[in-house]
Amino acid sequence: MEIRDNNKVNLCFAFDNLRKELSRPYGILFTNNKVFLDFVSKSIQQGFKVITVGDYVSRVLEENGIIPFLEVIDGKTKRSIPQHRAIVKNKEYRVTNEAGKIRFEIFEIIENILKDRDGGVVFVNGEEDLLVIPVILSANNGDIVIYGQPNAGAVVIIVNEMIKWRVRDILEKAVVEEC
């Protein structure tokens, strides 16, 4: 997807009609931190990038010496509890994103970060949950995308063409509207 002159674009994908579909885990649900951390460590040893969406999963990894290539965070867990500030990285980006939506401009920002060899942190003013979608679409096959499943554990998605197809299918069902 290419968006030209994205500074002038004030459009979002809205997902109100897809809440039920988006509420289920789309990868491997880990409820045991040791098993989760072992899995992530092995993925890194194989040369794949680890990308996190959410403050809690980012913090758990950092506390265990695993620094994600890209972190997408909003400073909260469950929309209200203040969380950690990510380990400072060379590249930090600030974006605004409303709950239940994805701003068009965020697709390009995430794609550019994932192409960069240094990674970075995206700080979201608003809600970061749905940003798993542009992350998956921009990640390389084999990369690991991790997000938190409230009151359940961490969901790990191993990016491949099938998951990208599923995410594109969800994106096609979203409604485009002004942000």
From Swiss-Prot:
Protein family (similarity comment): Belongs to the GTP-dependent DPCK family.
Name any one Pfam family assigned in the record.
DUF359
Q: Name one GO molecular function term.
A: kinase activity
Designated name of the protein: GTP-dependent dephospho-CoA kinase
InterPro entries according to UniProt: GTP-dep_dephospho-CoA_kin
- List S-S links within the chain: none
Task: Answer whether the UniProt record assigns the keyword Chaperone to this protein.
Answer: no
GO terms for biological process, alphabetical: coenzyme A biosynthetic process
EC number(s) reported in the record: 2.7.1.237
Q: Which pathway does the protein contribute to?
A: Cofactor biosynthesis; coenzyme A biosynthesis
The domain of life for this entry's organism is: Archaea
Function noted in UniProt = Catalyzes the GTP-dependent phosphorylation of the 3'-hydroxyl group of dephosphocoenzyme A to form coenzyme A (CoA).
Coiled-coil positions: none
Q: Does the keyword Transferase apply?
A: yes
Where do the annotations place GTP binding? 55, 57, 74, 76, 128
Keyword field: Coenzyme A biosynthesis, GTP-binding, Kinase, Nucleotide-binding, Transferase
Provide the reaction this enzyme catalyses: 3'-dephospho-CoA + GTP = GDP + CoA + H(+)
